[in-house]
Amino acid sequence: MEKHGTNEGALWGGRFSGGPSEAMFALSVSTHFDWVLAPYDVLASKAHAKVLHSAGLLSDADLDTMLEGLDQLGRDVADGSFGPLPSDEDVHGAMERGLIDRVGPEVGGRLRAGRSRNDQVATLFRMWVRDAIRGIAVGVTELIDALTTQAAAHPDAIMPGKTHFQAAQPVLLAHQLQAHAQPLLRDLERIRDLDKRLAVSPYGSGALAGSSLQLNPEAIAAELGFDSAADNSIDATSSRDFASEAAFVLAQIAVDMSRLAEEIIAWCTPEFGYIVLADAWSTGSSIMPQKKNPDVAELTRGKTGRLIGNLAGLLATLKAQPLAYNRDLQEDKEPIVDSVAQLNLLLPAMTGLVSTLTFNTDRMRELAPAGYTLATDLAEWMVREGVPFREAHEASGACVRIAEGRGVDLVDLTDEELAGVDPRLTPAVRDVLTIEGAVASRATRGGTAGDRVSEQRDRINQANADHLAWATTPVRS
């Protein structure tokens, strides 16, 4: 088996007489996905250099040289002039090589004291995820804003509400749109709650047992924007439940968008005819000239399966690892980086799609009473007249059966037909057999009455603004 050169430049080569085989190195190398951590490596290395200095392990001059070298390395990473070589095993080795190239081995070689790749990567990955979820949160707030803006533009439009995908009761279009905003708000709450657990720094935990060099994990944690340092060095280096939790939150965002996407796909069909897609957010067919396809919504629905798969795969990776660190954990980053990348594609696309929808409110209004959606209003009118609901439910169902037999709506039943079902069904019941009356009567908190929906929208917008303010506040000063 061919060898991959020597271990010169590797972070672990002293114990070995030769380098890894080509196949071993190909399996081991991770710079193609962990290079996203390079900017965070610079930040953490600067903080680590300062605690080495505070512990008397770096002179003033060496600290200045090291910080200048790290700053230059950070600039070179940012502008692309420094990157990993084919011989670099991972981001950590590449970045140490870059520092030594800039400050020399005498100073650059001192930085590794008191830290392991185990605590280093756990810290850098947390830093990356904290920034990434804030970017996702901004995208979610923009989608919520698109939903509430459309809701505010159609305050009185009535549509069929459905359960089991069957006609149920009339609701306001604004109520339906805001129903999609609510789970997205909860997703933002999940992001912020996740961040509380992400804000614990593993730095200073070493390989698993901590450090004997009397370094200061709390100082590093504070400089890197963490709320605290980890309480248990074994757990800090070996746990990735923060990653699986992030994978869940990201997948849940996709699932919530997929439900919205599913409705958009249905609504733009001729059978529904509720909406027209903007040309900029739809595609055509290579053979059927008439087609206008909801590709944004379909890709959202399809990519959601990908994010669910990322979550399932990561959980499977974590399920049977003994303490402490195991190389299996190298597999933690790709699923999360991919899920973030997919949401960064989907969120602006779905926001653009929603914000440019044209609603056929006349069509929605026409279909709102179809399927006898006012049957519950008839039954509840009887309840208000003192009839037990069991009897009212039976009477309303009987009215539906008669109307179905005649092929008419409930409001088209004659006074005699209503009274024949139950003498307590007087002509006054007709006051509630309108979709406007049905909507207006649902005036309790959370209901579909116009005033309640407007209040809901105000609360959504207020919460959304608070989440946006959090998401746009930098983790590190």
From Swiss-Prot:
Keywords: Amino-acid biosynthesis, Arginine biosynthesis, Cytoplasm, Lyase. GO terms for molecular function: argininosuccinate lyase activity. CDD domains: Argininosuccinate_lyase. InterPro entries: Arg_succ_lyase_C (IPR029419), Argininosuccinate_lyase (IPR009049), Fumarase/histidase_N (IPR024083), Fumarate_lyase_CS (IPR020557), Fumarate_lyase_fam (IPR000362), Fumarate_lyase_N (IPR022761), L-Aspartase-like (IPR008948). Its EC number is 4.3.2.1. Pfam families: ASL_C2, Lyase_1. It catalyses: 2-(N(omega)-L-arginino)succinate = fumarate + L-arginine. This is Argininosuccinate lyase.
